[in-house]
């Protein structure tokens, strides 16, 4: 192993006797997990006892290392000094419930225990339980370094905020939706220590991973600024997957490479106070120890980046002709997108970074062009609809310059304020109707106000806003650009979870009038294939395909929702890239398209890689005509819709 001292190596290599921590984050789909795994492998190979932890609800460490990992700390085969764990939010929540309740059983009666159990049925418990695991691993003296492969950017920021938020909540004492505060004094100390450690640059390093694309780097800039406000600075930026110069032999890919290099130049000037490392796109997927070692060698040992076409797995020969069009039926796709008799709700979801927002926006423009009154909404905390439309997109539906089309994004702070107002107004009305002079109304309202300061109120507020879009008047179609896969499942499970919690009689959760019935209607609408369509967006590689498939199965099993459409994005154009590198990647894509078709067995929308991402209405119209199957659908073709 060489001893070259790269800037990236200085960031990740431990230099003290205390356990150190390295966090990798970034827009989903940029190779964050690959870089995390490569870093952990490199550290272990250099004799550091290393633990790799993913807090992403859609983990893929098992796929990268080609072995089962799961919720227990697992030794990685053939890598001494390396262990890994994929935190399972469901398992973590149950463990948290049992750890909270068991010490109380000898002290409290059955009625009191039942009250605690009811509190712990709050959906917020899953969030704090996952974080509880996260905090536990920040107190792991048996390791030299703990590498965190964190959830995609918007949710990572939320995770980073949790220590302060829950600490403030526990300061108040009394009862919380995560259990009685008096039982969690030890948690309070843990959270205080976590806050101190996260902001200690001598022990904690924060690294972003991005693709050489403007949207990816824009996201990193925003996230780095948000982290700085929390007192956490980032020290490393890894630009992953740039096109190697040696394989770009035609104007299309020469142009894409030039664009990428311009982005890398921008990164060098914008992030000049941070270490910068780059790694090229390979002809095949990065999995297995040999390729992970290559990534680590380039990033941390200063080895020259190489592209070995022959090293990629290739199941097709150079003589094979790849015809992507055989995998799609445009009419079948269009049938799943247009309304029948009532307002249709379209959900585009998938692993972050697969082009989900672009596909959702493109589909919305095409539907509006066809004459349907359309609203496109993003529920993703890392939203960028405004960048795609080149128009302001706010909390309330507003026009983006296209007839029949409005757009909105959920502003979490405003949603929380709206929810607080809704709850407090209803509480006051409820006590006014009782007209009981023995009740101290202001004290009761003050108690509710305090409960609304809990971090879990943010989750309920986001849900309320999400549900409100099912009540928007005047739209034939509402298109949801949802958060990345694991978090989308959490959002879609919330109506059922919160309804169950509200049935327990919790004042705050049940303060909004008739919420239970409203949630029932939303659940039924999402489960009705004549009114709701769920489309999984992916690029045709193993990890995004499997994450989408697992998520689709979870949707079916946990929420009773069937997948309607799959979207295969970033297909390599057949007219360009006439060499072994792109032939290999194109053949690989065809192989995965076949597997996607077999696994999902639903209509497939195909979207090609473009010279530039479609931005602005003109680009979106052109792109939509090519990919949605809606070209030619107009006023004369569509049925009369009864809008909500």
Curated annotation (Swiss-Prot):
Catalytic activities: arsenite(in) + ATP + H2O = arsenite(out) + ADP + phosphate + H(+)
EC number: 7.3.2.7
Superkingdom to which the source organism belongs: Archaea
Translocase keyword on record: yes
SUPFAM superfamilies named among the record's database cross-references: P-loop containing nucleoside triphosphate hydrolases
UniProt induction comment: By arsenite and antimonite.
Effect of deleting the gene: Deletion of the arsADRC operon results in increased sensitivity to arsenite and antimonite but not arsenate.
InterPro entries named among the record's database cross-references: Anion-transp_ATPase-like_dom, Ars_ATPase, ATPase_ArsA/GET3, P-loop_NTPase
Keywords, in A-Z order: Arsenical resistance, ATP-binding, Nucleotide-binding, Plasmid, Translocase
Binding site for ATP: 26-33, 350-357
Molecular function GO labels: ATP binding; ATP hydrolysis activity; ATPase-coupled arsenite transmembrane transporter activity
Protein function: Anion-transporting ATPase. Catalyzes the extrusion of arsenite. Involved in resistance to arsenite and antimonite but not to arsenate.
Family: Belongs to the arsA ATPase family.
Name of this chain's protein: Putative arsenical pump-driving ATPase
């Amino acid at each position: 192993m060489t001893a070259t001292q790269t800037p990236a190596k200085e960031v990740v290599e431990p230099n003290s006797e205390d356990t150190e921590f390295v966090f990798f984050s970034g827009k989903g789909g940029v190779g964050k997990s690959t870089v995390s795994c490569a870093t952990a492998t490199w550290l272990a190979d250099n004799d550091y006892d290393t633990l790799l932890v993913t807090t992403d609800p859609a983990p893929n460490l098992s796929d990268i290392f080609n072995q089962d990992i799961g919720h227990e700390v697992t030794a990685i085969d053939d890598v001494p000094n390396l262990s890994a764990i994929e935190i399972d939010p469901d398992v973590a929540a149950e463990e948290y419930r049992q750890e909270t309740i068991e010490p109380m059983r000898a002290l409290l009666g059955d009625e009191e225990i039942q009250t605690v159990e009811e509190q712990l049925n709050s959906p917020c418990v899953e969030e704090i339980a996952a974080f509880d695991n996260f905090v536990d691993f920040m107190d792991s003296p048996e390791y030299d370094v703990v590498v965190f492969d964190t959830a995609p950017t918007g949710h990572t920021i939320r995770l980073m905020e949790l220590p302060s938020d829950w600490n403030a909540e526990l300061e108040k004492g009394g009862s919380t939706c995560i259990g009685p505060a008096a039982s969690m004094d030890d948690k309070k100390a843990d959270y205080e220590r976590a806050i101190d450690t996260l902001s200690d640059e001598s022990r904690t390093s924060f690294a972003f991973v991005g693709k050489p694309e403007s949207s990816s780097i824009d996201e990193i800039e925003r996230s780095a600024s948000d982290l700085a406000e929390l007192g956490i600075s980032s020290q490393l930026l890894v630009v992953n997957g740039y096109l190697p110069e040696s394989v770009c032999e035609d104007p299309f890919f020469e142009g894409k490479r030039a664009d990428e290099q311009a982005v890398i130049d921008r990164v060098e000037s914008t992030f000049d106070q941070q270490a910068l490392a780059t790694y090229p796109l390979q002809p095949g997927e990065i999995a297995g120890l040999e390729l992970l070692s290559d990534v680590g060698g380039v990033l941390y040992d200063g080895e020259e980046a190489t592209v070995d076409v022959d090293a990629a797995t290739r199941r097709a020969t150079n003589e094979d002709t790849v015809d992507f069009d055989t995998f799609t039926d445009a009419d079948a796709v269009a049938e799943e997108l247009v309304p029948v008799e009532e307002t249709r709700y379209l959900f585009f979801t998938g692993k972050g970074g697969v082009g989900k927002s672009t596909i959702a926006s493109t589909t919305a423009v095409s539907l509006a062009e066809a004459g349907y009154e359309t609203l496109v909404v993003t529920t993703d905390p890392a939203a960028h609809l405004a960048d795609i439309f080149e128009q302001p997109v706010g909390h309330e539906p507003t026009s983006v310059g296209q007839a029949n089309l409005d757009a909105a994004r959920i502003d979490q702070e405003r949603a929380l304020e709206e929810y607080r107002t809704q709850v407090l107004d209803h509480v006051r009305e409820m006590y006014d109707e009782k007209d009981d002079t023995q009740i101290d109304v202001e004290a009761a309202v003050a108690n509710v106000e305090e409960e609304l300061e809990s971090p879990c109120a943010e989750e309920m507020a986001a849900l309320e806003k999400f549900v409100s879009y099912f009540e928007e008047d005047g739209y034939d179609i509402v298109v949801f650009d949802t958060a990345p896969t694991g978090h989308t499942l959490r959002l879609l499970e919330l109506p059922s979870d919160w309804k169950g919690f509200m049935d327990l009689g919790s004042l705050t959760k049940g303060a909004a009038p008739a919420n239970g019935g409203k949630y029932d209607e939303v659940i039924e609408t999402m489960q009705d294939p004549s009114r709701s369509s769920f489309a999984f967006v992916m690029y045709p590689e193993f990890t995004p395909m499997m994450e989408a498939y697992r998520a689709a199965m979870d949707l079916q099993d946990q929420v009773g929702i069937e997948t309607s459409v799959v979207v295969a994005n970033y297909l390599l154009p057949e007219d360009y890239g006439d060499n072994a590198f792109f032939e290999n990647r194109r053949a690989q894509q065809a192989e995965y398209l076949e597997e996607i078709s077999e696994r999902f067995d639903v209509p497939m929308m195909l979207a090609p890689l473009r010279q530039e991402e479609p931005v602005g209405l003109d680009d979106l119209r052109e792109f939509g005509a090519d990919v949605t199957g809606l070209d030619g659908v107009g006023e004369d073709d569509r049925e009369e819709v009864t809008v909500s």
